[in-house]
């Protein structure tokens, strides 16, 4: 959600910020997407001023009627005016309530303002590579994709999953199921024991307000799964973890608040028809380790770098080649002000593919869910609460990490070497197949 006062104070700047996102606003409006917001806001402010005048006059009439009655004077005209005023006040209050709802609707579907250092560009082709870590493996055989390896081993069953649930699901068996579980446990242990995150086990079903708080609703309902009782399956643990602060005022001394969770994630992939139809890259259900941080406005940029480094350490411990990408304006997510994607090398595809996104959402989500903190007191009175900054990142997607391990650690005979970091979680198993 956006700060209405900031839009009011500089509608042109807000309009320019939305144009970076590809939102031009009404034709001919210099203020762009801010124009309808500012127009409705100004109309509301005029109506509020008029309402205050009506309420003042109503109070004056009440006193005048009382005085007239005590003096034995006729109050018919005064009472008629009072009746008309009550109707005007009721009408004005109803309009203000409806216009407030419309204003919220206008604001709720506008994306976050991007940081100044986010590059312009329409889509992923304009993303900027910042660094590469690790060299892609060199095989003396033709690298196979993960689904070819998994099916040949008899440990990855797409036909069985389709029988149970339809397309974009997978059944893992035996050592591949163990390997996926090992990846999740390894990541959790790393983030908790070395990076200072607190493990949380959150609900997988949440309500409308929770989805609204992190920005999934109202704009992206078609990307989500909804139950018959109106709850939503979480698309990422970011949703419940971040919303734990909804409506709270946190003590500044408790920040940064760092949380992690290993949960299933559920996505309809409504806009992905025809993309990655084979294998596990794009699933309706997948496991993911999520990282969430709540911090002060002054610390959020550094926290973003730290969180991204924590996610990178997973790939480095696993010996997986990757690159860090700074997303451009057209590829940055709705709630994010700045996002880094980590892309892991997949030899079977001969390409880097996303395995983690780490985003600084600034105060955007906090304003939607009213998550605040109280700065340290510096004067005679307690400091006024301010919105926290929220950050989230994959630390990392477990299913995609499984794919990356399979493809980067494959052998000529179709077996898979287990990375050293995972062997303690595999009871010493060093090879699958």
Curated annotation (Swiss-Prot):
Q: Which domain of life is it from?
A: Bacteria
Quote the InterPro entries the UniProt record gives.
Answer: aa-tRNA-synt_IIb, aa-tRNA-synth_II, aa-tRNA-synth_II/BPL/LPL, Ser-tRNA-ligase_type_1, Ser-tRNA-synth_1_N, SerRS_1_N_sf, SerRS_core, tRNA-bd_arm
Q: Which UniProt keywords apply?
A: Aminoacyl-tRNA synthetase, ATP-binding, Cytoplasm, Ligase, Nucleotide-binding, Protein biosynthesis
The main location is cytoplasm
Amino acids binding L-serine: 236-238, 290, 394
Report residues binding ATP.
Answer: 267-269, 354-357
Keyword Zinc-finger found: no
Question: Is Aminoacyl-tRNA synthetase among the key words of this record?
Answer: yes
Gene Ontology CC, one term:
cytoplasm
Q: Where in the cell is it found?
A: Cytoplasm
Pfam families for this protein:
Seryl_tRNA_N, tRNA-synt_2b
EC numbers? 6.1.1.11
State the reactions this protein catalyses: tRNA(Ser) + L-serine + ATP = L-seryl-tRNA(Ser) + AMP + diphosphate + H(+); tRNA(Sec) + L-serine + ATP = L-seryl-tRNA(Sec) + AMP + diphosphate + H(+)
> What is this protein's function?
Catalyzes the attachment of serine to tRNA(Ser). Is also able to aminoacylate tRNA(Sec) with serine, to form the misacylated tRNA L-seryl-tRNA(Sec), which will be further converted into selenocysteinyl-tRNA(Sec).
Q: Which family does it belong to?
A: Belongs to the class-II aminoacyl-tRNA synthetase family. Type-1 seryl-tRNA synthetase subfamily.
Could you give the subunit structure recorded for this chain?
Homodimer. The tRNA molecule binds across the dimer.
- Protein name stated in the entry: Serine--tRNA ligase
Natural source organism: Acidiphilium cryptum (strain JF-5)
Q: Which gene encodes it?
A: serS
